[in-house]
Amino acid sequence: AEFGGGVKVGLNLTLADGNLVVASGHGIDFSATSGSGTSELLDDYEEGTFTPALSHNGGSSVSIAVGAATGTYVKVGRLVTVTFNLNVTPSYSSAPTYWLIQGFPFAVNVGIGSILGYNNNNAASFAGRTETGGNNALFFATLASGTAANTFWTASYETDS
């Protein structure tokens, strides 16, 4: 059945089978709550995969051999959370100033996102931040030249996409 004026349900709405489909440009309205936010409309949800990459700033004769590079993401509204694995072996004659993780699935809105990582090969932890306007994050850490780093990461950031 199709109703042009809307349907009001007094108690609960249960779908016995199938999906709840919301038309493009609309979402779930939480305005009945007493929050003071600027938007109470949940209008975006997405999950998927991406391929992260490692780059650098500074240093000399830097090269990066990449083994595994796999990532997943969940986007709810403007908040993106990524988790990924990078298995890399950097080589250099002088160390880079910092390392860049690139290839995030959505552009970073503001530089307030954070990233945490762990090197499974030597139990080292990393922390960093996202970069405004790009699809990347930077971190300051020592990745030993010629030594494999099997790293695991998670990051959360805001996007306008």
Specify the residue positions occupied by each region the protein language model found.
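Intrinsic low-complexity, repeat-rich intrinsically disordered segments enriched
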Residues: 1-59, 83, 90, 118
